[in-house]
Amino acid sequence: MDDLHGDLRGIIEHLDHVQNLGIDVLYMTPIFKSYSSHKYDIIDYYQIDPSFGTTEDLRELVQEAHKRGMKIVMDAVFNHTGREFFAFEDIMEKGEKSKYLDWYYIEKFPLESERGEIPNYKCFGYYGGMPKLNLKNPEVEKFFTDVACYWIKECDIDGWRMDVGDESSHYFWKN
């Protein structure tokens, strides 16, 4: 266990024990593709990080949890992304000509930030590896609404926990 975390198969294998503890809701911290250990700097919201398993593993986990009367709630990290997320990469490549420019809060060009430095764009916790999204942008809102609906339909998850809800736009959550 060098990576300091388990995986979806491990949760499936221990569901009976978890149920015997009286737990009826499992809250999953981010499990989407990311290069960090904490996974809050997501680069692909439609792919389970391979270190945790596959979409089929998540589907099986939800099915097995439901058989035991348990629910699965996933972490909705919709306030910020990783720098390697497609929209932010496009901005880094095309600068002011990027069609995703309004997806983030860019203060000036060229973008300047290595991990650990305070960047010239808004980000979560002043950490350049997690650029902050503009949730007032209808395209961003649609993207993340589609993400939320996808996982509900694809794997039958029961709900979402909204990460950084206090920093997210009320406009976004109302819609």
Regions found by a protein language model. Give the residues of each.
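Active-site and adjacent substrate-binding regions of carbohydrate-active enzymes
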Residues: 1-175
